[in-house]
Amino acid sequence: MILTIKPLQGKECNVQVTEDEKVSMVKELVSERLNIPANQQRLLYKGKALADEHRLSDYSIGPEAKLNLVVRPAGERSGMASSSSAVSGVWQTLSTVLAKHFSPADAAKVQEQLVKDYERSLRQLSLDDIERLAGRLLHPDSEGMDTSYMD
């Protein structure tokens, strides 16, 4: 099948792939066509970022689909980006584990639900919860520490 890749600013290109192709391979093909390093590419389909380890079929990407390409500046990984890459690494590891136990479609659904639950849990934390958690992490040996939030 042929996919159209459209950078936010620039000329689009077409790549020939199969639906079982991994996103990382699509990035390599785009790299060859547009001279944009794969590690600086972020592919989006219908507004959703595509993970390198997933296959196109995991996202129901079919023939004649159009992917948007966001190009990250070289050397962008610092500060907040490094912590988000650590979180991203957790999701990539989870994806690998889920792939061993579920079909690609089911693994994607399970991971999507886990991400939603995780984000919902973070939004529900109060400042007091965060303060207690930070205190516990910064002072793990403190005796009189309130640990009721960990139940």
UniProtKB/Swiss-Prot annotation:
Self-association and partners: Component of the BAT3 complex.
GO molecular function, one term: protein-folding chaperone binding
Major site of localization recorded for this protein: cytoplasm
Locations listed in the record: Cytoplasm, Cytosol
The keyword Ribonucleoprotein is annotated on this UniProt entry: no
Species, as recorded: Salmo salar
Protein name: Ubiquitin-like protein 4A-B
Matches recorded under SMART domains: UBQ (SM00213)
Gene: ubl4ab
Alphabetically ordered keywords of this record: Cytoplasm, Transport
